[in-house]
Every structure is written in structure tokens, then in C-alpha cells.
């Protein structure tokens, strides 16, 4: 029980700005087991967003609430995944060789491609969530971040790391397939309860497809994955899920 709590808190501490202030075991096995809780952390974040939406929907227009929810997410996560998307785009669109791309991705400064990617990412999230709320799919506020994290877990089933060292290496190739498939089954079952089978499976397949395409792009550009590409995967998975759900 103590190890389970350790791994759960480790995921919160690693992926959010929520102050845990505890000395936790941070071995590779803890991250491997803790992967089960990554969608749970996303559920907590999405759940808090949904409660904010419910609390404000009678006082503010839906479009204003969505902006506040995106701001809230950025504050809670520290913009971790959005930063990964920006760094990935800066590197990949630089059209340089592998070593230079990785060097660009490690640069803390954001470039023009990263800026464009962030603007498009935020605009799409805003418009898609706003449109889905108006369509009666407010539960997408909760589901989208969960699907994004599930996409990360599937990407991490690969063992191809682009760097010898990096924060992403504690996840890449360090996933248990039974854990990934088990938590995915639970999430899909819950999503089916709220959205129905068709509106769950098709957007989810779309998210997995974009994850696989990103994986192929990573192999082509840097011969593997990094922590930044995992963040990019989360953002692309969320956007794809929301986009296809809106089309249903």
C-alpha cells in the first residue's frame, strides 16, 4: 500500500505543480508502476476543470470559461506538455541533422515554429472545447486530458530513445503492456458510458493513429523519442480526440 501511494504521489509531483513536499522513491520501477496513475492524474486535472466549469456556467459565457480552464491547466501542469510541443516543432521544422535538432529542442528559448505551434494548439483547444460544450459534450473537458496521457503511455511502449540521458528516458521503454492495456480498457469503458461506443472508439483510434504517425516522424528526424516528443504526443492526442469527437 505504501509503495502504491508513493508511485501515485510521484506522478502528481512529476507531472503537475501541485506541492507534494515529500521525499519519494524515484527509481525506474516506481515510474514503471506509476504509469498506471498517469491517466488518474489527468482525471484529477480534468475533474477540477469540470468542477470549475459547473461552478461558473451560470455566471459567465461558455467561451470565457473555456479560456479560464485552459489557463488553469497551464498553471497546474506548468505548461509541461505544451512546452514539449513547442520544443519539438522548433527542432523538427529546423530541417537540421539529428544532433542539431536535439540541441535546438534542449534550448530553453522558444523559436518561431514553437510559437506558431503553441498559438495553434491553444486556439484549437479553445474552439474545440467551446464547440463541444455548446453541443452538449462538456464531459470532453474531463476526457481529453486523459486520452492525451493514454497516448503518451502507448508511445512509451517503444524502447527507442533519441538521447542517452533525459527525463523522457525514465518512461520510454519502461512501460508494462498489461498496465497500459488495463488502464486503457477502464478509460474506454468510462468514456463509453458518457459518450457511447461509437463516439468513444473512433476518436480514440484517431488519437492512437496520430500517436503512431508522430512516432514515425520521431524515428525519421531523431531516430527515437525524447521527453519533449512525449509532451507533443499529449497535445496532439488531445486535439485529435476533440476534433474527431466534434465531427461525430
UniProtKB/Swiss-Prot annotation:
Transmembrane segments: 36-56, 59-79, 114-134, 137-157, 170-190, 199-219
Source superkingdom: Bacteria
Bilayer topology: Multi-pass membrane protein
Keywords: Cell membrane, Cobalamin biosynthesis, Magnesium, Membrane, Transferase, Transmembrane, Transmembrane helix
GO molecular function terms noted in the UniProt entry: adenosylcobinamide-GDP ribazoletransferase activity; cobalamin 5'-phosphate synthase activity
Pfam families to which the protein is assigned, alphabetical: CobS
GO terms under biological process: cobalamin biosynthetic process
Signal peptide: none
Pathway: Cofactor biosynthesis; adenosylcobalamin biosynthesis; adenosylcobalamin from cob(II)yrinate a,c-diamide: step 7/7
First-listed, main subcellular location of the protein, grouped into a coarse class: membrane
InterPro entries hit by this protein: CobS
Enzyme Commission number(s): 2.7.8.26
Protein's cellular compartments: Cell membrane
Cofactor(s) this protein requires: Mg(2+)
Catalyzed reaction equations: alpha-ribazole + adenosylcob(III)inamide-GDP = adenosylcob(III)alamin + GMP + H(+); alpha-ribazole 5'-phosphate + adenosylcob(III)inamide-GDP = adenosylcob(III)alamin 5'-phosphate + GMP + H(+)
Cellular component aspect of the GO annotation: plasma membrane
Its job: Joins adenosylcobinamide-GDP and alpha-ribazole to generate adenosylcobalamin (Ado-cobalamin). Also synthesizes adenosylcobalamin 5'-phosphate from adenosylcobinamide-GDP and alpha-ribazole 5'-phosphate.
Family per record: Belongs to the CobS family.
Name of the protein: Adenosylcobinamide-GDP ribazoletransferase
Source organism (scientific name): Clostridium botulinum (strain Kyoto / Type A2)
Gene of this entry: cobS
Amino acid at each position: 500500500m505504501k509503495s502504491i501511494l508513493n508511485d501515485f504521489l510521484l506522478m502528481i509531483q512529476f507531472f503537475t505543480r501541485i506541492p507534494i513536499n515529500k521525499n519519494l522513491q524515484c527509481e525506474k520501477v516506481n515510474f514503471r508502476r506509476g504509469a498506471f496513475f498517469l491517466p488518474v492524474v489527468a482525471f484529477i486535472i480534468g475533474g477540477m476543470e469540470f468542477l470549475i466549469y459547473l461552478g461558473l456556467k451560470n455566471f459567465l459565457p461558455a467561451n470565457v470559461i473555456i479560456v479560464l480552464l485552459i489557463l488553469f491547466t497551464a498553471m497546474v501542469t506548468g505548461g509541461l506538455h505544451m512546452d514539449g510541443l513547442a520544443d519539438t516543432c522548433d527542432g523538427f521544422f529546423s530541417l537540421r541533422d539529428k544532433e542539431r535538432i536535439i540541441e535546438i529542442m534542449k534550448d530553453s528559448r522558444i523559436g518561431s515554429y514553437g510559437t506558431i505551434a503553441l498559438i495553434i494548439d491553444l486556439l484549437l483547444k479553445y474552439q474545440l472545447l467551446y464547440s463541444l460544450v455548446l453541443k452538449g459534450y462538456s464531459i470532453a473537458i474531463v476526457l481529453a486530458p486523459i486520452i492525451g496521457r493514454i497516448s503518451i503511455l502507448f508511445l512509451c511502449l517503444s524502447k527507442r530513445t533519441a538521447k542517452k540521458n533525459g527525463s523522457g528516458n525514465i518512461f520510454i521503454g519502461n512501460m508494462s503492456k498489461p498496465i497500459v492495456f488495463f488502464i486503457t480498457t477502464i478509460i474506454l469503458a468510462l468514456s463509453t458510458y458518457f459518450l457511447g461506443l461509437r463516439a468513444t472508439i473512433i476518436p480514440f483510434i484517431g488519437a492512437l493513429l496520430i500517436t503512431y504517425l508522430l512516432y514515425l516522424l520521431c524515428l525519421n528526424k531523431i531516430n527515437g523519442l525524447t521527453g519533449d516528443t512525449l509532451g507533443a504526443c499529449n497535445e496532439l492526442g488531445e486535439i485529435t480526440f476533440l476534433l474527431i469527437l466534434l465531427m461525430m
